[in-house]
UniProtKB/Swiss-Prot annotation:
GO CC, alphabetical: cytosol
Source organism of this protein record: Helicobacter pylori (strain ATCC 700392 / 26695) (Campylobacter pylori)
Chain sites annotated for binding substrate: S254
Cofactor: binding comment: Binds 2 magnesium ions per subunit.
Entry EC no(s): 1.1.1.86
EC supergroup of this enzyme: oxidoreductase
InterPro entries, per the entry: 6-PGluconate_DH-like_C_sf, KARI, KARI_C, KARI_N, KARI_prok, NAD(P)-bd_dom_sf
Cofactor: Mg(2+)
Origin superkingdom: Bacteria
Pathway assigned in UniProt: Amino-acid biosynthesis; L-isoleucine biosynthesis; L-isoleucine from 2-oxobutanoate: step 2/4; Amino-acid biosynthesis; L-valine biosynthesis; L-valine from pyruvate: step 2/4
Binding site for Mg(2+) 1: D193, E197
Family assignment from sequence similarity: Belongs to the ketol-acid reductoisomerase family.
Gene (UniProt): ilvC
Keyword set includes Iron: no
Protein name as catalogued: Ketol-acid reductoisomerase (NADP(+))
Amino acid sequence: MALPVYYDKDIDLGVIQSLQVGIIGYGAQGEAQALNLRDSKVKARIGLYQGSLSVSKAKKEGFEVLEVKELVQNSDVIMALLPDELHKEVLEKEVIPFLKEGQIVGFAHGFSVHFNQVVLPKGVGAILVAPKGPGSALREEYLKNRGLYHLIAIEQESSIHNAKAVALSYAKAMGGGRMGVLETSFKEECESDLFGEQAVLCGGLEAIVRMGFETLIKAGYPEELAYFECVHEVKLVADLLHYKGVEGLRKHISNTAEFGAIKAREPMGKLLKKRMQKILKKIQNGSFAKDFLLEKSLNYPRLNTERKALKETKIEQIGEILRAPFNHKK
């Protein structure tokens, strides 16, 4: 099923330009979105808690910084650009008690709304505006007069403003209309995003890379060669896949590599498909969200243990040496 797609010519930038936007958070996304809004002639202010290390940075870049509850009381559109696991705590204390009918609260990911961590009052709009890329890329592409694909979704309508028109206009201010703004739902964005991260982009890729590296090491191959073949060259293939697609990738590799890929895909594909279906099921039934929020409540014991252990692995130790020339050039 094809999603509706909107471009600059379809979207009225004046909608968001007529409203006061408040951005909660000034991390990578918050900074990039605030700067893009300003360059798109949109009024934007930043909301941060007292003592935040980001206050001086936001002020240095010319933004007015308010406490979160004050920002909420003086904004038409409030963008919650915080880590997913902080939404419930921050919004319940600093945002929801101060909302008025007609305001709109926006999110860059559907997690907290879809999994009922955040429930907004009736008459307050809930929109999703999700750039398909990190904050650094969002800003860089905007400055090059290009943009990233954006997803928008409407979970709840505003009693005053047209939530869809606001979401589209906001995405245009981000540069999204230059590339394409696709309309979806909070559910679809959230579940597909989590699945992509876990099964392919982060979890899946890391598992394949590490297992490949360890397989070669165990078989007696030098660590340097194992790293080159299983880690270093991933970027070359990923770039081809990004710009050329699967067929284009096939056309740019040798017959040996293509035939080997087909042979390897057959046994690996069957196993991966079953595992991926289980991963998706746990996302859909809320098991993953429950586990993640429990992890947060315990102050991230699993994450902290994994991060510490990763530093001691052979793949990281040899990788640090081999990456040094590239990092030095930067």
